[in-house]
Amino acid sequence: MAAKDVKFGNDARVKMLRGVNVLADAVKVTLGPKGRNVVLDKSFGAPTITKDGVSVAREIELEDKFENMGAQMVKEVASKANDAAGDGTTTATVLAQAIITEGLKAVAAGMNPMDLKRGIDKAVTAAVEELKALSVPCSDSKAIAQVGTISANSDETVGKLIAEAMDKVGKEGVITVEDGTGLQDELDVVEGMQFDRGYLSPYFINKPETGAVELESPFILLADKKISNIREMLPVLEAVAKAGKPLLIIAEDVEGEALATLVVNTMRGIVKVAAVKAPGFGDRRKAMLQDIATLTGGTVISEEIGMELEKATLEDLGQAKRVVINKDTTTIIDGVGEEAAIQGRVAQIRQQIEEATSDYDREKLQERVAKLAGGVAVIKVGAATEVEMKEKKARVEDALHATRAAVEEGVVAGGGVALIRVASKLADLRGQNEDQNVGIKVALRAMEAPLRQIVLNCGEEPSVVANTVKGGDGNYGYNAATEEYGNMIDMGILDPTKVTRSALQYAASVAGLMITTECMVTDLPKNDAADLGAAGGMGGMGGMGGMM
């Protein structure tokens, strides 16, 4: 086992604070509408330019292991805030630094660290309740656009695009961000259900100019099995041909003789058919087939429930107004499934989301809800260079997370004003002893830090602005973009309540752990460990000499 380096008490805390400050100072320059850029060197390719707090935090690794421990713990604050609300990483880092700095001063002055932590926790719990009381619902497009604009560093086009996307696909809809091809940002909306499976044979194409298969009012056969024998399908094909409608086959696979016969029938014009593989794998494929069945009013033909393909009738087939299939995707538009059945299926999947333990499962389930409930919107980010594209894409993703958080828990006045109001309301909060009171004061003082940092990044004097804002009430605050005072909500400076709440809670959680740290242990650097080993060996040799 490698030799360890151990530090205690004040020595440990000083080192830890140094690491916290390095990381926080690098991150906090990005805060606010006039936040600065940070350039990150990459081992290959061009450097990345970003104003995203968590991207900066992730890059920081310090040489001194004790300092690095402090930095990594604050990095955890940024990551947790990002995971919970998708934004507010810089605010969380600024709050953590402020609480840790003031808290460690109090510990150095002889306060009891455990009581300080209890005081901080008490203040934060009360602050969260006050934030909820200040919160106003965010339901209209204008408010959604304003939240998106603020989170995307005052880029109005991004805010408007996100609001438009939410209008088109609903609050539950899936909105994805992709690289665009031009200089302008674009919004693409895919109505209906789309999944990532294309046609099984290019001979199904009936729109050569677009390279797509388009079926108007088709029947849809859903089979949870491989189809290789055409005889299984003859009864269904004959019934569909008599009805004079096209047929879409969605199965685990269609191969060999079955696929060849379908192609020949299509080319001869006997019956218009297209076949695609079912989306997903394993249990997820079964679930997605069931989703499509619910959407189209059909039944999944599955041998597991004793249904055979030869006995399928037109009643077992789903229907839709239109289906478009290209090389990679299939889109089913306006399925004829009953609204009540679709809503029941959506409620069932939402229940599974509540119970899901992994982020991946949760994300996949949310995609399924969106496909059933509304559709998918794609924001295509335009930029002149790849470096700008990466930076802008990160901002759009942040803005998207922020708007979702705003819809979920509402909004409060932005620009750090909500925390200032909360702190002033809690001025009379008291703990069980004097040390806890100091902890409460530490937390309340730290709540001014985001506003002060926003002002500092503008090049103004933080204390002057903070005192002016404290002198006002309600939503009165400082608009750093225009450098004027006024009602933050009227000026469209909004923060999602969830983002502010998460930032405060995670900052206080990690700060409390660091304030109560009394000992730090790390591996000795390799050179020091080698020197120790060499010294031990020399002593042994001296003993040998004595024996001679």
Curated annotation (Swiss-Prot):
Its main location: cytoplasm. Its EC number is 5.6.1.7. During the substrate-folding cycle, the two GroEL rings separate for effective substrate binding and chaperonin activity. Ring separation is triggered by ATP binding to the trans ring of the asymmetric GroEL:GroES complex and avoids formation of functionally impaired symmetric GroEL:GroES2 complexes. Activity of the GroEL-GroES chaperonin complex requires Mg-ATP. UMPylation of the chaperone by SelO/YdiU negatively regulates its activity, and may facilitate survival under stress conditions. Together with its co-chaperonin GroES, plays an essential role in assisting protein folding. The GroEL-GroES system forms a nano-cage that allows encapsulation of the non-native substrate proteins and provides a physical environment optimized to promote and accelerate protein folding, probably by preventing aggregation and by entropically destabilizing folding intermediates. The modification N6-succinyllysine is found at K34, K51, K117, K277, K321, K390. Belongs to the chaperonin (HSP60) family. This is Chaperonin GroEL. InterPro entries: Chaperonin_Cpn60_CS (IPR018370), Cpn60/GroEL (IPR001844), Cpn60/GroEL/TCP-1 (IPR002423), GroEL-like_apical_dom_sf (IPR027409), GROEL-like_equatorial_sf (IPR027413), TCP-1-like_intermed_sf (IPR027410). One of its GO terms (molecular function) is ATP-dependent protein folding chaperone. CDD domains: GroEL. ATP binds at residues 30-33, 51, 87-91, 415, 479-481, 495. The gene is groEL. One of its GO terms (biological process) is virion assembly.
